[in-house]
A protein has these predicted regions:
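Glycine- and Gly-Pro-enriched alpha-helical subdomains that act as flexible
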Residues: 72-111, 242-342
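Active-site loops and adjacent core secondary-structure elements that bind or stabilize anionic groups
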Residues: 1-199, 214-232
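Glycine-rich phosphate/pyrophosphate-binding loops
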Residues: 61-62, 67-72, 76-78, 232, ...
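C-terminal binding/interaction regions
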Residues: 117, 121-122, 135-165, 170-172, ...
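Active-site-proximal loop/turn and secondary-structure-junction residues that shape catalytic pockets
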Residues: 70, 125, 237-240, 248, ...
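Flexible, glycine/charged-enriched surface loops at secondary-structure junctions
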Residues: 57-65, 165-167, 230-237, 267-278, ...
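Conserved helix-loop functional segments at active or binding sites
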Residues: 53, 227, 264-268, 353, ...
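Gly-rich Lys/Arg/Thr-decorated short loops/hinges at beta-loop-alpha junctions or inter-strand turns
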Residues: 23-35, 109-115, 189-208, 285-307, ...
Length: 392
């Protein structure tokens, strides 16, 4: 099949719509279930190369959770500890495969933004991954293959309409790519830059310490940024993203947005949050929303009389501003990546408030000296990669 007709494009008025191969060849994917839309497939074909490159760079299974052209989260298939399982809604004794761990981590990076996501897997989707996805609100999934059991589970989602796309793992896109904007065709070479440890050799700070886990997290961050709408900044820890700031016109706003998401990821691990007395039978999205409000400045919206009764068995004690600040201050060992240079040291100032110890950015600002000086002030290790990663 060399063409797939779609219901409409980005919006219902944009008809007709289709995806096709310009050379007349067969499409490199098969729709196993559902009827994926235009935006679904944009997410699918941005997310699959991301997870494939993560797997190639690290040797570990990888997954991503995509929404509207950018990753809400991406992760490697590292085991979950007991706290991970609790905050990601996994049963303590549940057996999980590496690819299931990868997706659970990717979705757990920013569960609120992953609501209605497109899932991407580097490896075969197995029953454990499908079973977890079954309990989440998701629009579809792309993977190189699916086990029979996983396929049967996923086909029960959304009344049998869940979108399942199988990608040819051997497919390599053409070296040139095109897109039309306002009737004008743009053409460029594909961004085939390889992200690996060789990009991290130019450490420009006084602190040269860069352990293997930090190198891994830098690679996770940079590959994620390669497929994130610019401007973008990504915080990573323990083989997963914990905050992605996408599509901001200001670099500092990227750093703040991603930093606030990283703070929220860490606040989900606070003892008060882990002990929240949710009512029996509460749905995962309702828990996510309640936690998001509880750890915010708008906590009264979920703790007020008439509100808390809908989600909690009893009214929990507030998580105060000082408690939140003290908890986030404990965070450390975080890596941050940027798709372009930091123009000012204020980005470093903001990043270190979220526990950032390692930074990877291209360098090249006329104020690089100021950025390096700020990193040195906090003992941060910073590598200049020399590689910009804009994505539009």
């Amino acid at each position: 099949m060399n063409e797939l007709e779609l219901k409409y494009g980005c919006n219902p008025n944009q008809k007709p719509a289709r995806v096709f191969m310009k050379d007349g060849g067969d499409l490199p994917f098969t729709v196993l279930n559902g009827k994926p839309g235009y935006i679904n497939l944009l997410d699918a074909f941005n997310s699959f190369p991301l997870v494939r490159e993560l797997k190639e760079a690290t040797g570990l299974p990888a997954a991503a959770s995509f929404k509207h052209g950018s990753p809400a989260g991406a992760a490697l298939g590292l085991p979950l500890d007991e706290v991970d399982k609790q905050i990601y809604f996994v049963e303590p004794d549940e057996a999980l495969s590496p690819i299931a761990c990868a997706y659970i981590r990717a979705r757990g990076a920013d569960r609120l933004c992953s609501y209605g996501d497109w899932a991407a897997l580097s490896d075969e989707c197995d029953a454990a991954t499908a079973e977890y996805l079954k309990g989440e609100v998701s629009d579809g999934i792309i993977a190189p293959s699916f086990s029979e059991e996983a396929l049967a589970i996923l086909k029960t989602k959304k009344g049998g309409k869940y979108n399942i796309v199988q990608m040819d793992p051997a497919y390599i896109p053409a070296p040139q790519e095109q897109k039309d904007v306002f009737g004008v065709t743009f053409e460029q070479g594909r961004n085939n830059c390889k992200i690996d440890e060789s990009l991290l050799a130019n450490i420009v700070t006084e602190n040269k310490n860069l352990p293997d886990d930090a190198k891994r997290d830098m690679i996770v961050s940079l590959i994620t940024l390669k497929y994130t709408q610019s401007n973008s900044v990504c915080y990573a820890k323990d083989g997963q993203t914990i905050g992605v700031g996408a599509g901001q016109q200001s670099r500092i706003h990227c750093t703040r947005l991603a930093g606030s998401k990283a703070d929220n990821w860490y606040l989900r691990r606070h003892p008060k949050v882990l002990a929240l007395p949710f009512v029996d039978g509460i749905r995962r999205p309702d828990r996510d929303n309640a936690i998001d409000v509880y750890i915010s400045d708008e906590c009264d919206d979920v703790l007020a009389d008439g509100a808390w009764q809908r989600v909690f068995k009893e009214r929990p004690e507030p998580l105060t501003v000082q408690e939140r600040k003290d908890w986030v201050a404990r965070q450390s060992g975080v890596t941050v990546g940027s798709d372009a240079f930091f123009p000012f040291g204020d980005n470093v100032e903001r990043a270190r408030k979220s526990g950032v110890t390692y930074i990877a950015e291209p360098g090249g600002s006329i104020r690089d000296d100021n950025v390096i000086e700020t990193a040195n002030k906090y003992g941060i290790t910073m590598a200049f990669t020399g590689q910009r990663l804009f994505h539009h």
